[in-house]
Structure formats: structure tokens, C-alpha cells
Amino acid sequence: MGSASRASLDSARRVLAELGGVDLSTAGQLLGAGRAIGGSTHLLSALADTGIAPEVKHSIVDRVFGATVQEPTLRVLRAVVDGRWSSHDELLAGIEELGIRAVAISAPEGTPVESELFTFGRAVSTDDGLELAFGDKLGDPEAKSTLVHRLLDGRASEQTVVIVEQLVQQPRGRRIGELVRHAATLVADQAGLTIATVSVASPLSPEQSERLAQALSRRYSRRIELNQVVDRDLVGGLRVQIGDDVIDGSVATRINDLRLQFA
């Protein structure tokens, strides 16, 4: 995201924070507004046009959405169109991020939205049929939404369902795995957490997980949430990824390094 877009997003995030508590209805309305804007070339162009005065954009937002969404949603949308966005896609990405953060805020304490997203993403990435169904660019968004409900209703929180439904209905050219990972990162960040994806040859015990999380928290000066991936090809040890950082202590990598030394 460009610097202008990042500054605009930060400004809109402050407005979202000023709302205090946000319910799931408001979050869903924000995501729905983003889909509506993305589905109308004329509306998107008008709201992203830096030559149109903010008060005119406010009028457009109020006219289009005033009868269907609550005032908190309108306040966030007005903040979005007040900003300068580097591209149409980044404006849509900004609304989506704000919506996902709003969903995270709406979750009751202890709701495992981030881990549910991680589990869903892993399930899809290991099932070619699901990946094809969600990744089909010509697929009907409503059919994808129906599939989401069939897979997640009764198995995941309402917040997770709302987020995944958004991702499959407005992918904007992104793969489902990328979408879900990014959403999980946003949810964790909203809770003040950083995600560490830990690949292991066999599952860590609760005690090992706790020690690793504490060690990583000290290193990064932030609370760390672990997501485990079992990968038998690692042979032993583990590989940790936090953002762009990779800590690779797997036996497979050590063996490969030795092979290279003796090649």
C-alpha cells in the first residue's frame, strides 16, 4: 500500500477506534458497503477522485448508504473518502481492512477468530476441490457464500463466517490462502498480537508451545500467538515464520546445508 493510502487508512482507523464498541452488524455493513462500491465503477471512481471535494463525497456516501446502514458505518465511510488513495484497489483494500478490524472488535472476549481463520485456510489449502471452488474467477459469489455457510455454520464464530464470506465474494484477484492469512493477521493485530506460524515434524506439547511463545514474545517485544503446521518432511526441529522473518531450525534444512557443503 502506498504512503498516501497508508496515511488515509491510519486516519480512518482512528475514527473506527473513536467509535468505542462496534457490533457485528456495523462491521458487516462496512464490508457490504465496500463490496457495493467495488461493484460500481462510477461510484468507486467518484469516491477515489482527489479532484472532488470531501463534502461532495460525503453527500454521495450519505445518498447511497444513508438509508441502509447505521451512523457509525457512515462515519467510517466518510473518513475513508476524506483520504487520498493511491489507487482504486487500495481504497477498497482500506475499507476491507477497516471492516475486518471492526469484526474483530465485535467479537466477545475469548472468541478464537484468528485461529478459526487459520484452520479454515489450512483446510482449503489442502483440498484441491475447495481451492478451485473458491478461486474460480467466474464463480458465482452467492454460490461461494453458500459454500462458506455450509462449511462453517455451527463450527466457527459468526465473526469468522462474516470475514470469510467477505473474502470469497470480493477476492480482487487474490488467492484464498493469501486472503485468509492476511485477514488472520489483521484480527491478531487488532487484539495486540503477532502471529507466528510454527512448522513442526510432530505437534508441540502445551508446555513446549508456551515456552516458545514466551521466548518469541521476549524477542519481538509483543504478545505472540502460535499457529502450528505439522510437516513430516521437516524430520525434526521446527521452522518459525513471523511476517517476513524466518527462523529455521529444522533437521531437513540442516541436512540440506550439509549436502551443499559437501557438493
Swiss-Prot record:
<dbReference type="InterPro" id="IPR000711">
    <property type="entry name" value="ATPase_OSCP/dsu"/>
</dbReference>
<dbReference type="InterPro" id="IPR020781">
    <property type="entry name" value="ATPase_OSCP/d_CS"/>
</dbReference>
<comment type="function">
    <text>This protein is part of the stalk that links CF(0) to CF(1). It either transmits conformational changes from CF(0) to CF(1) or is implicated in proton conduction.</text>
</comment>
<comment type="subunit">
    <text>F-type ATPases have 2 components, F(1) - the catalytic core - and F(0) - the membrane proton channel. F(1) has five subunits: alpha(3), beta(3), gamma(1), delta(1), epsilon(1). F(0) has three main subunits: a(1), b(2) and c(10-14). The alpha and beta chains form an alternating ring which encloses part of the gamma chain. F(1) is attached to F(0) by a central stalk formed by the gamma and epsilon chains, while a peripheral stalk is formed by the delta and b chains.</text>
</comment>
<keyword id="KW-1003">Cell membrane</keyword>
<dbReference type="Pfam" id="PF00213">
    <property type="entry name" value="OSCP"/>
</dbReference>
<dbReference type="GO" id="GO:0045259">
    <property type="term" value="C:proton-transporting ATP synthase complex"/>
</dbReference>
<keyword id="KW-0375">Hydrogen ion transport</keyword>
<dbReference type="GO" id="GO:0005886">
    <property type="term" value="C:plasma membrane"/>
</dbReference>
<protein>
    <recommendedName>
        <fullName>ATP synthase subunit delta</fullName>
    </recommendedName>
</protein>
<dbReference type="GO" id="GO:0046933">
    <property type="term" value="F:proton-transporting ATP synthase activity, rotational mechanism"/>
</dbReference>
<keyword id="KW-0139">CF(1)</keyword>
<keyword id="KW-0066">ATP synthesis</keyword>
<keyword id="KW-0813">Transport</keyword>
<keyword id="KW-0406">Ion transport</keyword>
<comment type="similarity">
    <text>Belongs to the ATPase delta chain family.</text>
</comment>
<comment type="function">
    <text>F(1)F(0) ATP synthase produces ATP from ADP in the presence of a proton or sodium gradient. F-type ATPases consist of two structural domains, F(1) containing the extramembraneous catalytic core and F(0) containing the membrane proton channel, linked together by a central stalk and a peripheral stalk. During catalysis, ATP synthesis in the catalytic domain of F(1) is coupled via a rotary mechanism of the central stalk subunits to proton translocation.</text>
</comment>
<keyword id="KW-0472">Membrane</keyword>
